[in-house]
Amino acid sequence: MKYDIIGDIHGCLQEFQNLTEKLGYNWSSGLPVHPDQRKLAFVGDITDRGPHSLRMIEIVWELVIHKKVAYYAPGNHCNKLYRFFLGRNVTIAHGLETTVAEYEALPSHKQNMIKEKFITLYEQSPLYHVLDEKRLLVCHAGIRQDYIGRQDKKVQTFVLYGDITGEKHADGSPVRRDWAKEYKGTTWIVYGHTPVKEPRFVNHTVNIDTGAVFGGKLTGLRYPEMEIVSVPSSLPFVPEKFRPIS
């Protein structure tokens, strides 16, 4: 099986359509379909900050849950939206406010439909996907080699948030260790979460979050070809969001 792994979309629907078309997908049915049956895999954070978060939920639900032709690993923004939909007390900030504003503008029956779809998508998706006979792993923020195969709370924190130290940068964002430098495995780990100006290959890991929602690019990785395909963002460039990893 061949896969096209998509970086953090964050509600950037137009960029997602442009990227999938560049990857050879056809949208005539209203969903991206590849003539060679390649499968999409999402590294999470499909919502928040961008303009079309709810449409992204519908598309990913259709592909992953309804048609079962794609893979989705939830990100930290997905986890927070899930908790919001469950009625938990979450702070509506850091991008969640854009998704909530879209949601609250809907009539109640449509709200219920979106909420049910996202809760189902989140609950039926594992923390990470191991594909191609363990040669490929798709997750949101990365994973340590000794965590592969585990699903416990420590692993959940790592795959959602990265290798956080507990310290904060001056702007309040968490300090993260560069786990990829320590990774010695042969399974390719494809992830996102931390915006980088260009896809970052370190050992057998690739960060494909090229900051589409911050005016960078939306990036896909063609696997097993290991080819990078990107499209430019239509949003303004925010340079301070592209922070070097500690």
Curated annotation (Swiss-Prot):
Gene3D superfamilies: 3.60.21.10. One of its GO terms (cellular component) is cytoplasm. Keywords: Hydrolase, Nickel. Its EC number is 3.6.1.17. It catalyses: P(1),P(4)-bis(5'-guanosyl) tetraphosphate + H2O = GMP + GTP + 2 H(+). Its cofactor is Ni(2+). It comes from the Bacteria. GO terms for molecular function: bis(5'-nucleosyl)-tetraphosphatase (asymmetrical) activity; nickel cation binding; phosphatase activity. The keyword S-adenosyl-L-methionine does not apply. It is an enzyme of class 3 (hydrolase). Asymmetrically hydrolyzes Ap4p to yield AMP and ATP. Belongs to the PrpE family. HAMAP family: PrpE. This is Bis(5'-nucleosyl)-tetraphosphatase PrpE [asymmetrical]. It comes from Bacillus cereus (strain AH187).
